[in-house]
UniProtKB/Swiss-Prot annotation:
Subunit structure and binding partners: The PsaA/B heterodimer binds the P700 chlorophyll special pair and subsequent electron acceptors. PSI consists of a core antenna complex that captures photons, and an electron transfer chain that converts photonic excitation into a charge separation. The eukaryotic PSI reaction center is composed of at least 11 subunits.
EC number(s) given by UniProt: 1.97.1.12
Entry's cofactor comment: P700 is a chlorophyll a/chlorophyll a' dimer, A0 is one or more chlorophyll a, A1 is one or both phylloquinones and FX is a shared 4Fe-4S iron-sulfur center.
UniProt-recorded name of the protein: Photosystem I P700 chlorophyll a apoprotein A2
Localization annotation: Plastid, Chloroplast thylakoid membrane
Family: Belongs to the PsaA/PsaB family.
Chain positions recorded as [4Fe-4S] cluster binding sites: C560, C569
GO molecular function, one term: 4 iron, 4 sulfur cluster binding
Keywords: 4Fe-4S, Chlorophyll, Chloroplast, Chromophore, Electron transport, Iron, Iron-sulfur, Magnesium, Membrane, Metal-binding, Oxidoreductase, Photosynthesis, Photosystem I, Plastid, Thylakoid, Transmembrane, Transmembrane helix, Transport
GO biological process, one term: photosynthesis
Transmembrane spans: 47-70, 136-159, 176-200, 274-292, 331-354, 370-396, 418-440, 518-536, 576-597, 644-666, 708-728
């Protein structure tokens, strides 16, 4: 029996006598469309089955979180005193630890070295009604079983008799019905049920478990108000402002409210407001999922909806005609839309998690807030770049000019020059003006005349904040004007709670902004527009440009079209994606620097530092980066080590990975080929070393692959470096 040679999905690659076999095999492992013997139906079936595997991994991971906190954490102690006990993620078992290390990492009331949790899981589990380790073990066991079931389901759907057909996958209306009504709608309804039946009673000191949840009414009147139409009863008698969370002291009976603002003690949104929100979402999505025609011949066909989207003026060509077939037959288009949506949502999660904290006491755990914000912004930036990458692949592999004649897609391609040049102009304008202001202010600081800085108040943004009810700026408008219709309309509902929150300086809702915010806002706008320019140009030029009209014939990633055809290097759609990641990381750096520094000064009661130092570049370098890195360069000192030592090491390690990236990025392929050949020669001539023979002849990475390897090192190093800086500088100050 012949041994199977990697990659099994490509006979051609498997016969390659060089190390290219390994690298190209890894690079194309997930490009199902390019595999030998692949059919359209099989691609859909493989992706469908892999979704179950993905969910299985997610459930296993969350199960592990629950299990390790229950086993090695201090959840029950934390629940007794959330503000003073540090939450433990898990124990550290490390044979290299000497006594100083053991002492440094033994904290949070533990008996040995532990890691502190900065993910917010303690706050989340506490808010949703978990109180004991047994609750965590139960959740862990349930998710482990679910994980095994999903793994089995994935395997099952790969078996011949259980593979869905292509027509099943392309039944868009039924899928929308399932996803909107089933997944979004019913799960939101179920979550409302959990909040009402378990979380809200727990917040009022009442334990509801598997043994008593069928006999414990979440509201004294039960379902009577629902059947009689007296829904307002569920909002009457809410928790009072003096309510002590997790006790009956000051608690009410309301389960679905619209109080607005935050619970005064926990500084998080009211649980009854969140239950109301999820119920509303459930109703909307259950209805939305039933708008489309499935088995019963009622409702809309998506193709009819899209085909009727043609502007009556005739000025917008074919509108959405032909889009249904195009999208429904292109997995890359669908993935692009999904990634764009999820990326945007992920960024919104980052923004709302700190400004409107949903979990009890999250607002008091500064390191966790910083970690969650940074994590979600980084994830969002990568996902959104991926949306454009798959958009470009769609244009190369799936776009049919005949099918889309004159519609919105064709029109985007027809006037791409106007789109790209406008984006280019905006990026240049933002870049030169913002940098010009920063540099002018730097020079004025350097020459000792800070009063000559150009400082611009963000009046439009302040006006928007004022219209939402912020009184500080003195704009008498909308919600900040007691005489406005908007003010009086909501006065009896959510407005008092909201106004109290927005004008309270102890939270992060609509922070006070000034000239430093104005400048960094425009720096971030520059980053966003430049990233967008690179991505949009990459997608719109993916099929061809004036320089290379036949680009689509070369695929998504190609280095050049050989010698003798100038200008064809570095213009593939992949090159645009590759460049966009650098700009994306640059932008997310500015975003997180801004958020973190502004919050550090807010938490320390030292907002003047940000206001004064953020108007010039030297202020950012000196008073944010240098000043806050002291914890990182002090991890090891003559007095031994401390609990920040690991972050000091990660900080250095991150720089090392980042720097390694440049070895792949700033080097010509021929140089590496010559170097490898020299190394191979020296091995073959050296006794003992020449006992090891290569099966594959070593060759250098292709230009495209070296770019990928360099980009990955650059990104990973960048992330490690900033993560270490963020966590060490925040936890070093606030514990």
């Amino acid at each position: 029996m012949a041994t199977k040679v990697f990659p099994s999905f490509s006979k051609g690659l498997a016969q390659d006598p060089t190390t290219r076999r390994i690298w190209f095999g890894i690079a194309t492992a997930h490009d199902f469309e390019s595999h030998d013997g692949m059919t359209e139906e099989l691609v859909y079936q493989k992706i469908f089955a892999s979704h179950f595997g993905q969910l299985s991994i997610i459930f296993l991971w969350t199960s592990g979180n629950l299990f390790h906190v229950a086993w090695q954490g201090n959840f029950e102690q934390w629940v007794q005193d959330p503000l003073h006990v540090r939450p433990i993620a898990h124990a550290i078992w490390d044979p290299h630890f000497g006594q100083p290390a053991v002492e440094a990492f033994t904290r949070g009331g533990a008996t040995g070295p532990v890691n502190i949790a900065t993910s917010g899981v303690y706050q989340w589990w506490y808010t949703i009604g978990l109180r004991a380790n047994q609750d965590l073990y139960n959740g862990s066991l349930f998710l482990s079983i679910l994980s095994a079931l999903f793994l089995l389901a994935g395997w099952l759907h790969l078996q011949k008799n259980f593979r869905p057909s292509l027509s099943w996958f392309k039944d868009a209306e039924s899928r929308l019905n399932h996803h909107l009504s089933g997944l979004f709608g019913i799960s939101s309804l179920a979550w409302t049920g959990h909040l009402v039946h378990v979380a809200i009673p727990a917040s009022r000191g009442q334990r509801v478990g598997w043994d008593n949840f069928l006999t414990t009414l979440p509201h004294p009147q039960g379902l009577a108000p629902l059947w009689t139409g007296n829904w307002a009863a569920y909002a009457q008698n809410p928790d009072s402002a003096s309510h002590i969370f997790s006790t009956s002291q000051g608690s009410g009976q309301a389960i679905l409210t619209f109080l607005g603002g935050f619970h005064p003690q926990t500084q998080s949104l009211w649980l009854s407001d969140m239950a109301h929100h999820h119920l509303a979402i459930a109703v909307i999505f259950v209805l939305a999922g039933h708008m489309y025609r499935t088995s019963f011949g009622i409702g809309h066909r998506l193709s009819d909806i899209l085909d009727s989207h043609v502007a009556p003026s005739g000025n917008m060509g074919g509108g959405h005609r032909g889009l249904f077939e195009t999208i429904n037959n292109s997995l890359h288009f669908q993935l692009g839309l999904a990634l764009a949506s999820v990326g945007t949502i992920c960024s919104l999660v980052a923004q709302h998690m700190y400004s409107l904290p949903p979990y009890a006491y999250l607002a008091n755990d500064f390191t966790t807030q910083a970690a969650l914000y940074t994590h979600h912004q980084y994830i969002a930036s990568f996902i959104i770049c991926g949306a454009f990458a798959h958009g470009a692949i769609f244009f190369i592999r799936d776009y049919d000019p005949e099918q889309n004649k004159g519609n919105v897609l064709a029109r985007m391609l027809d006037h791409k020059e106007a789109i790209i040049s406008h984006l280019s102009w905006v990026s240049l304008f933002l870049g030169f003006h913002t940098l010009g202001l920063y540099v002018h202010n730097d020079v004025m600081q350097a020459f000792g005349t800070p009063e000559k800085q150009i400082l611009i108040e963000p009046v439009f943004a302040q006006w928007i904040q004022a219209s939402h009810g912020k009184a500080l700026y003195g704009f008498d408008v909308l919600l900040s004007s007691s005489g406005s219709v908007a003010f009086s309309a909501s006065q009896t509902l959510w407005l008092p709670g909201w106004l109290d929150a927005i004008n309270n300086n102890s939270n992060s809702l609509f922070l006070n902004i000034g000239p430093g915010d104005f400048l960094v806002h425009h720096a971030i706008a520059l980053g966003l527009h430049t990233t967008t320019l690179i991505l949009v140009k990459g997608a719109l030029d993916a099929r061809g440009s004036k320089l290379m009209p036949d680009k689509k014939d070369f695929g998504y990633s190609f280095p050049c079209d050989g010698p003798g055809r100038g200008g064809t290097c570095d213009i593939s759609a992949y090159d645009a994606f590759y460049l966009s990641i650098f700009w994306s990381l640059n932008t997310v750096g500015w975003v997180t620097f801004y958020w973190h520094w502004k919050h550090l000064t807010l938490w320390q009661g030292n907002v003047a530092q940000f206001d004064e130092s953020s108007t010039y570049i030297m202020g950012w370098l000196r008073d944010y980066l240098w000043l806050n890195s002291s914890q990182l360069i002090n991890g090891y000192n003559p007095f031994g080590m401390n609990s920040l030592s690991v972050w000091a090491w990660v900080f250095l390690f991150g720089h090392l990975i980042y720097a390694t990236g440049f070895m792949f990025l700033i080097s010509w392929r021929g140089y590496w080929q010559e170097l490898i050949e020299t190394l191979v020669w020296s091995h073959e001539k050296t006794p003992i070393a020449n006992l090891v023979q290569w099966v594959d002849k070593p060759v250098a990475l292709s230009i495209v692959q070296a770019r990928l390897v360099g980009l990955v090192h650059f990104s990973v190093g960048y992330i490690f470096t900033y993560a270490a800086f963020l966590i060490a500088s925040t936890s070093g100050k606030f514990g």
